Amino acid sequence: MPRSQINGNFIDKTFSIVANILLRIIPTTSGEKEAFTYYRDGMSAQSEGNYAEALQNYYEATRLEIDPYDRSYILYNIGLIHTSNGEHTKALEYYFRALERNPFLPQAFNNMAVICHYRGEQAIRQGDSEIAEAWSDQAAEYWKQAISLTPGNYIEAHNWLKITGRFE
């Protein structure tokens, strides 16, 4: 049974109903409809913390989805799951892939910056200031890109850039 038929959450049910209506009235191919169904089920599983199921749905959605813009969001969500699982290298890979298809995803730049900042902090704890500086510089570049796409957002990152002298 598709996940959309078993959701107990009111918001998920509402989203599923609206999505099903849109799929019926918007002219799309059967492959696009199937890709969206997997994507929707992936989002539902992800919101419930069922990451293995979400990944399975997202991988199937990427196999079917041909639109680069839509693929970017699928890849971004895969990156989110890998971030949540502490698989930062994989997460960075999926954020990069998402940005290749859609360079206007500030949230992907932000998440990449957070990972780089975290790695910089780890390097500081390990006493490797050179590596820490490199990771922090990379975090700064990603945060600058996120901020340039959505000025007014990422206030904490903006402040960190100023405090560390990386804001230009």
From Swiss-Prot:
Name assigned to this protein: Photosystem I assembly protein Ycf3
Pfam families xrefs: TPR_1
Family as reported in the entry's similarity comment: Belongs to the Ycf3 family.
Glycoprotein in keyword set: no
GO CC aspect terms: chloroplast thylakoid membrane
Biological role stated in the UniProt entry: Essential for the assembly of the photosystem I (PSI) complex. May act as a chaperone-like factor to guide the assembly of the PSI subunits.
Gene: ycf3
Alphabetical GO biological process terms: photosynthesis
TPR repeats, residue ranges: 35-68, 72-105, 120-153
Gene3D superfamilies associated with the record: Tetratricopeptide repeat domain
Membrane topology: Peripheral membrane protein
Keywords, comma-separated and alphabetical: Chloroplast, Membrane, Photosynthesis, Plastid, Repeat, Thylakoid, TPR repeat
HAMAP family to which the protein is assigned, alphabetical: Ycf3
Subcellular location(s) per record: Plastid, Chloroplast thylakoid membrane
Cross-referenced InterPro entries: PSI_Ycf3_assembly, TPR-like_helical_dom_sf, TPR_rpt, Ycf3/AcsC/BcsC/TPR_MFPF
Taxonomic classification: Eukaryota, Viridiplantae, Streptophyta, Embryophyta, Tracheophyta
Signal peptide boundaries: none
